[in-house]
Amino acid sequence: MGKFPLREQSIVLIGFMGVGKTTIGKTVAKKLYRDFIDIDEEIEKRFKMPTKDIFRLYGEKTFRNAEKDIISEICQQRLKVVSLGGGAFLQKEIQEICLNSSIIFYLDLSWDRWKDRIELLMESRPVLQGKTMKEMKQLYEDRKPIYEQHHSRVDTDYHEIEEVADYIAESLKLAWDIYEPTS
């Protein structure tokens, strides 16, 4: 897995939109002394506008192509913590890039816990705009099997950001010590 030693491979966080990938990713990056990159923010920088405007003006296809290009570029770098947008991992090419070059953590939040966050998510998530609760649940269910392509799954239900970040950092350190001992 990957062209870099395990200790240097980038860490990629995947999961449904709004599960905390960005917040947890920033915390993990601090704990591991790595740079944090949010793919959606990188796309927004390139287009110089928010994601919802990119979707509206250029369409989802243009957004997804930019997403693939940026992920491909960033996953070839070492020592990063990367947060993918909720829909990024739906692209087979992105799955292959990430699985072959990085360590992937799937942040799994149950539907019931995710529903509690809907109010906070609606404005900033173009994919949710105009959807009923039933349609959102279907989207959640449809994407869940895709996220099963990972190296490690983390159940985030009822866990604080710090707890999840500690778990990820400690499990990585353990894996590094087992598979690449320093002495």
UniProtKB/Swiss-Prot annotation:
The record lists ATP as bound by G18, V19, G20, K21, T22, T23, R125
UniProt main location, coarse: cytoplasm
Query: Which cofactors are required for activity?
Result: Mg(2+)
Looking up PROSITE patterns in the UniProt record yields: SHIKIMATE_KINASE
Q: Which UniProt keywords apply?
A: Amino-acid biosynthesis, Aromatic amino acid biosynthesis, ATP-binding, Cytoplasm, Kinase, Magnesium, Metal-binding, Nucleotide-binding, Transferase
Residues annotated as binding Mg(2+)? T22
State how the cofactor is bound.
Binds 1 Mg(2+) ion per subunit.
- What GO terms in the biological process aspect are recorded for it? amino acid biosynthetic process; aromatic amino acid family biosynthetic process; chorismate biosynthetic process
Is this entry keyworded Metal-binding? yes
Q: Which GO terms describe its cellular component?
A: cytosol
Enzyme Commission code(s) on record: 2.7.1.71
Please give the Gene Ontology molecular function terms for this protein: ATP binding; magnesium ion binding; shikimate kinase activity
Q: Which residues bind substrate?
A: D40, R64, G86, R143
User: Where does the record say this protein resides?
Assistant: Cytoplasm
What reaction is this protein's catalytic activity? shikimate + ATP = 3-phosphoshikimate + ADP + H(+)
Which pathway does the protein contribute to? Answer: Metabolic intermediate biosynthesis; chorismate biosynthesis; chorismate from D-erythrose 4-phosphate and phosphoenolpyruvate: step 5/7
Q: What does this protein do?
A: Catalyzes the specific phosphorylation of the 3-hydroxyl group of shikimic acid using ATP as a cosubstrate.
Family assignment from sequence similarity = Belongs to the shikimate kinase family.
What PANTHER family does the record point to?
Answer: SHIKIMATE KINASE, SHIKIMATE KINASE 1, CHLOROPLASTIC
Q: Subunit details for this protein?
A: Monomer.
Annotated protein name in UniProt: Shikimate kinase
